[in-house]
C-alpha cells in the first residue's frame, strides 16, 4: 500500500525525544497515563490552554514546542470532546486529527492512548490507528517536485502507548486490512484515465488472487457470447475494449449463498455522442468509483479472512465519441433479453450495471446484491456530498445499510421507488429507454436498474456525491474518498459473517 506511515503499539513509557501527543476532554481533563506522561508540564499546558482559549473540543489541537518539564521537542494536546459518549467513528476521526497535526519533521511520534474515562480498550486504540492511516494517505506519485512539508504524517513512525500492546495489535490487524481496502479504492479513483483504462483496471483487480480471491475476466468475445449488449454498446466507441471482472471470496460454508457487490466502472466518461461540457470533464476519471469500492471491499474481506462467501463484479468501459460510438436512438438488447432505447448516451452507467447485475443474479444466485455507482448528478442536487442515495426493494437490507452508515460515518439516505417512477422509463420503441424526464432523475435511474435484478433482494447506492471530489474531512484529504469500503465491510461483519 502506498501510505508510508508506520503505526505500532508499545507499553507506556514517557518518551525522551520526538513528539508526544495526549488527549483531553472538553473540560481539559487528562487520563491517568497522560497525566503521568505530562508530569510537571500539566501546569504549563493549563496556562497555554487559557492563553490560546483551547477548550478541548473534539478534533481541536494545541501545539507546544520544547515544552518546559518534558524532554520531547513537541507536545500536541488533542481535544476529544465529550468522552463519555465517544464511539468508534469519533475515535477514527480523532486518529485523523492526530495525523493532521503531524508535520514532516515529526519522524518519531508517541500517542498516549487514554482518556479521562480510562485507558483505551484495544478496539479503541485500533480505531485511533486506523484514523491515522486513513488521514495520512496522499496520492502524489506523479509529482516530480515536492515541498518539504508536503509529506506530513505519511513518513512518520507513530507508536500508540497502550495498556496491552499485544491485544491492541490483534484488534488492529483486521482493521488495518480494511484501511488497505479503502486506500486501494482511493488509488484507483485517483489514477489518471490514460493509466487506468479497462484492461489495466482488470489487471489490478486480478492482483487479488494473491489473497486467495478467485478472479475471472470476461473480454469482449466472452461478453458477446453472453449477449451483454447493453454494456458492449457503451464501450464500442473506445479504443480500449470493455471488461467485466468477477471476483469471488469463499470464506464461508461451502455451498452457502454468496453476498454480491456490483460496481459501475466507467474509467472515463465523456458522455459519448451526448457529450458533456468541457468544464470539469477531467473529474470523469472518477466515474469508476463504484468499481473501485468493490475491489477495495473484496481486498478487505479476503485480507482479513472474512467468514463469508462474497462475489464482487465490476463492469469496466470507457464512454467515448468516435465514428463507431453508440447513438441516441439506437436500440440495444441486454443480457436479460430486454431491449433498451438509447435516449442519452451520457446515461451509460445504468447500461453497464444492467448486464452485470443480471449476470450476477443468474450465475451466482446471491443472498442479496448491493450495487454502487457514481450514477447521477441528480442525487447530488438532492443530498449534496454527505450522504449517498439508497434505493432498495428490501426493507431489511435497507435498514441494515442505514444502520452501518451511521456507525461508520459513510451515511446513506433512503429514496423512494414506485410504479409511478418506473413507467417514466417505458419506451415507445423498445421495452424501456435509458432516461426518463429531468424530474426525479436519480429515482428513474434506480428504477431502470431494478428491472435487471430478477427479484433478488437488492440495494443501489448512488455515490456520485461521496466517491470523488467530496469535501476533505478528518479521515480523508484525498480527491478520491474510497467511500463504501468501510460501510459494506461493516454490513458483512455485523449482519452476515459467521461468528467465531
UniProtKB/Swiss-Prot annotation:
Main location: cytoplasm
Pfam families: Peptidase_M17, Peptidase_M17_N
Residues the entry annotates as binding Mn(2+) 1: 269, 346, 348
Active site: 276, 350
Domain of life from the UniProt record: Bacteria
GO CC, one annotated term: cytoplasm
Cofactor: Mn(2+)
Residues at which Mn(2+) 2 binds: 264, 269, 287, 348
Catalytic activity: Release of an N-terminal amino acid, Xaa-|-Yaa-, in which Xaa is preferably Leu, but may be other amino acids including Pro although not Arg or Lys, and Yaa may be Pro. Amino acid amides and methyl esters are also readily hydrolyzed, but rates on arylamides are exceedingly low; Release of an N-terminal amino acid, preferentially leucine, but not glutamic or aspartic acids
Protein purpose: Presumably involved in the processing and regular turnover of intracellular proteins. Catalyzes the removal of unsubstituted N-terminal amino acids from various peptides.
HAMAP family: Cytosol_peptidase_M17 (MF_00181)
Record's protein name: Probable cytosol aminopeptidase
Gene source species: Rhodopseudomonas palustris (strain TIE-1)
Gene that encodes it: pepA
Amino acid at each position: 500500500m502506498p501510505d508510508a506511515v508506520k503505526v505500532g503499539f508499545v507499553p507506556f513509557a514517557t518518551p525522551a525525544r520526538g513528539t508526544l501527543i495526549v488527549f483531553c476532554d472538553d473540560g481539559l481533563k487528562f487520563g491517568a497515563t497522560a497525566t503521568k506522561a505530562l508530569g510537571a508540564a500539566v501546569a504549563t499546558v493549563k496556562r497555554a490552554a487559557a492563553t490560546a482559549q483551547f477548550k478541548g473540543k473534539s478534533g481541536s489541537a494545541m501545539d507546544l514546542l520544547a515544552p518546559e518539564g518534558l524532554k520531547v521537542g513537541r507536545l500536541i494536546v488533542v481535544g476529544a470532546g465529550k468522552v463519555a459518549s465517544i464511539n468508534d467513528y469519533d475515535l477514527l476521526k480523532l486518529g485523523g486529527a492526530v495525523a493532521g497535526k503531524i508535520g514532516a519533521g515529526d519522524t518519531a511520534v508517541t500517542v498516549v492512548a487514554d482518556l479521562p474515562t480510562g485507558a483505551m480498550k484495544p478496539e479503541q486504540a485500533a480505531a485511533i490507528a486506523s484514523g491515522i492511516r486513513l488521514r495520512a494517505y496522499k496520492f502524489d506519485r506523479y509529482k516530480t517536485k515536492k515541498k518539504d512539508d508536503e509529506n506530513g504524517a505519511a513518513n512518520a513512525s507513530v507508536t500508540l502507548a497502550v495498556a496491552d500492546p499485544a491485544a491492541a495489535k490483534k484488534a488492529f490487524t483486521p482493521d488495518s486490512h480494511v484501511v488497505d481496502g479503502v486506500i486501494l479504492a482511493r488509488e484507483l479513483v485517483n489514477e489518471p484515465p490514460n493509466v487506468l483504462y479497462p484492461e489495466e483496471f482488470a489487471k489490478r483487480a486480478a492482483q487479488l488472487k494473491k489473497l486467495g480471491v478467485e478472479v475471472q475476466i470476461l473480454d469482449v468475445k466472452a461478453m458477446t457470447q453472453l449477449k451483454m449488449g447493453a454494456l458492449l454498446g457503451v464501450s464500442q466507441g473506445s479504443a480500449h475494449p470493455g471488461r467485466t471482472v468477477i471476483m469471488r471470496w469463499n470464506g464461508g460454508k461451502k455451498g452457502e449463498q454468496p453476498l454480491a457487490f456490483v460496481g459501475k466502472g466507467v474509467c472515463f466518461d465523456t458522455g459519448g455522442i451526448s457529450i458533456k461540457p468541457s468544464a470539469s470533464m477531467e473529474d470523469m476519471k472518477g466515474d469508476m468509483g463504484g468499481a473501485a469500492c468493490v475491489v477495495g471491499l473484496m481486498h478487505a474481506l479476503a485480507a482479513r479472512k472474512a467468514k463469508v462467501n462474497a462475489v464482487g463484479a465490476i463492469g469496466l468501459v470507457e464512454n467515448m465519441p468516435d465514428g463507431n460510438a453508440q447513438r441516441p436512438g439506437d436500440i440495444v438488447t441486454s443480457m436479460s433479453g430486454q431491449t433498451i432505447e438509447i435516449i442519452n448516451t451520457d446515461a451509460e452507467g445504468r447500461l453497464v450495471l444492467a448486464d452485470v447485475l443480471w449476470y450476477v443474479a443468474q450465475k451466482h444466485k446471491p443472498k442479496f446484491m448491493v450495487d454502487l455507482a457514481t450514477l447521477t448528478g441528480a442525487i447530488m442536487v438532492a443530498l449534496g456530498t454527505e450522504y449517498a442515495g439508497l434505493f432498495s426493494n428490501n426493507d431489511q437490507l435497507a435498514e441494515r445499510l442505514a444502520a452501518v452508515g451511521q456507525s461508520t460515518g459513510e451515511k446513506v439516505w433512503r429514496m423512494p421507488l414506485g410504479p409511478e417512477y418506473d413507467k417514466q422509463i417505458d419506451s415507445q420503441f423498445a421495452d424501456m429507454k435509458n432516461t426518463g424526464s429531468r424530474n426525479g432523475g436519480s429515482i428513474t435511474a434506480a428504477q431502470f436498474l431494478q428491472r435487471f435484478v430478477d427479484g433478488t433482494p437488492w440495494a443501489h447506492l448512488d455515490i456520485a456525491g461521496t466517491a470523488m471530489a467530496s469535501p476533505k474531512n478528518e479521515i480523508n484529504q484525498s480527491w478520491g474518498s474510497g467511500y463504501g469500503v468501510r460501510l459494506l465491510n461493516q454490513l458483512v461483519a455485523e449482519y452476515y459473517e459467521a461468528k467465531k
